[in-house]
Amino acid sequence: MKVFDSLKALEKTKEFIDWRTNNKEYYLVSLFYISDKPNEIQIDYYNSKKNTITSFNYSKNSVFVVKDSQVMSKTKKELKPLVLEGISEFDNALETALSYKKEKHSKEEVYKTIIILQNDDTITKEGRIIWNIIFITNSFKVINYKLDAKNLELLSQNINSIFSFIQK
């Protein structure tokens, strides 16, 4: 999938242009892909004054807009804008994560893939744009790789049971 082409195409749609006319203070904060919807990408814009996100679910045939959702965050940190200059393509990031998975967890069969391009300030104080790639497996495990979005360096990796995310 060419996510940057999808972003450019979204920005040319009537829905986006009409929305952007009255919402200039919003800026791009994330791109979200889930393998259940292989031809769709969610593109998120953030308003720091309102602490809200407007999401565009974009595919070649449609645009669905979810306006002004409140940001749920424990830290109340302002989301940083995505600067796309020099960012590696989606397909290259996925290929890199799959090679790590093959090397470390080759027996785990992937059921679902989630890929997010986002700023992450848990890695460095100033933040870093990352490809956050999550594989959910048939054996109820979650394999997570965080890759530097520019050079695809592996920044962190972990594997957990999906049940570890359930609050008791």
Stretch-by-stretch model annotation:
Residues 1-168:
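Long, terminal "pre-/pro-" and other extracytoplasmic accessory regions
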